[in-house]
């Protein structure tokens, strides 16, 4: 939601609350549907506490789904048809990760079967959502868009989302290996994946410095990168016991 709001600020447009409501509810729905589609046959026999806890409180998933459907239905009546079509496209791209629509090595499944695709798929979906959705609604409402700024912003957003997502993959290396899910982190190993995080921080910061953004926004985004770098270096990758500190990236 915050990233979608930032898109409006970068383009110096008034924030559309209905787009933010769609962003929030659609994200919650996709996460919850992802959980349901990946539900093991016997969740309580899982080796992972997170899986056992989630499905021992499955009623919370359904409550959230019902609430989000209601709020989403309210919001979609306040945006243009072109925006709804684009939202449906983003939703289709998102669920393609879990839905068994393809075959790979003789097995039917979704994009999650392809080695290393998870990280890039998440970053793509979030970029399409937090950058593309506000812009599509602005275009449908008759606003002129600076396409150089749009593509530059989309590229930076994709890099930033890679940076924010990779530490979660590093945290989940053991669990993903247990489920035979070949993420970029499992393919590279923890040390090389951690190094890649630092490289993305520096690349993203360098591109920010020459970005066609207002100076105050540029300074704020560079400071956010500095905070991310400190979190990665001093807390997230350093602490092996409390690896749930990776969730601090959400606040950064």
Which role fits each region the language model picked out?
Residues 15-19, 61-104, 198-243:
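Transmembrane helix-loop-helix
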Residues 1, 40-64, 98-124, 183-193, ...:
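Interhelical loop and helix-boundary elements at the membrane-water interface
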Residues 152-156, 184-200:
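A loop-to-helix transmembrane entry motif
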Residues 23-45, 160-184:
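Acidic (Asp/Glu-rich) catalytic motifs at the cytosolic membrane interface
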Residues 90-93, 119-134, 155-168:
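Alpha-helical transmembrane segments of multi-pass integral membrane proteins
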Residues 1-67:
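N-terminal transmembrane signal-anchor/hairpin module of polytopic inner-membrane proteins
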């Amino acid at each position: 939601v915050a990233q979608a709001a930032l898109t409006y600020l970068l383009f110096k447009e008034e924030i559309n609350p209905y787009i933010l409501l769609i962003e929030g509810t659609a994200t919650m729905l996709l996460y919850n549907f992802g959980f349901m589609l990946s539900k093991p046959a016997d969740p309580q026999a899982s080796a992972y506490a997170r899986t056992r806890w989630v499905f021992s409180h499955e009623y919370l998933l359904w409550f959230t789904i019902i609430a989000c459907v209601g709020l989403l239905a309210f919001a979609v009546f306040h945006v243009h048809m072109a925006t709804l079509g684009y939202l449906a496209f983003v939703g289709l791209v998102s669920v393609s990760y879990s839905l068994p629509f393809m075959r790979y090595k003789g097995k039917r499944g979704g994009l999650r079967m392809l080695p290393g695709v998870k990280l890039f798929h998440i970053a793509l979906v979030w970029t399409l959502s937090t950058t593309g959705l506000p812009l599509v609604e602005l275009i449908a409402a008759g606003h002129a868009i600076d396409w150089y700024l749009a593509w530059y912003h989309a590229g930076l957003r994709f890099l930033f989302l890679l940076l924010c997502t990779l530490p979660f993959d590093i945290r989940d290396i053991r669990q993903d290996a247990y489920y035979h899910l070949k993420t970029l982190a499992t393919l590279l190993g923890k040390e090389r994946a951690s190094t890649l995080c630092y490289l993305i921080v520096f690349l993203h910061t360098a591109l920010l410095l020459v970005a066609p953004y207002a100076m105050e926004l540029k300074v704020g985004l560079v400071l956010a990168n500095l905070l991310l770098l400190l979190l990665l270096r001093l807390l997230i990758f350093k602490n092996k016991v409390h690896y749930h500190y990776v969730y601090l990236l959400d606040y950064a």
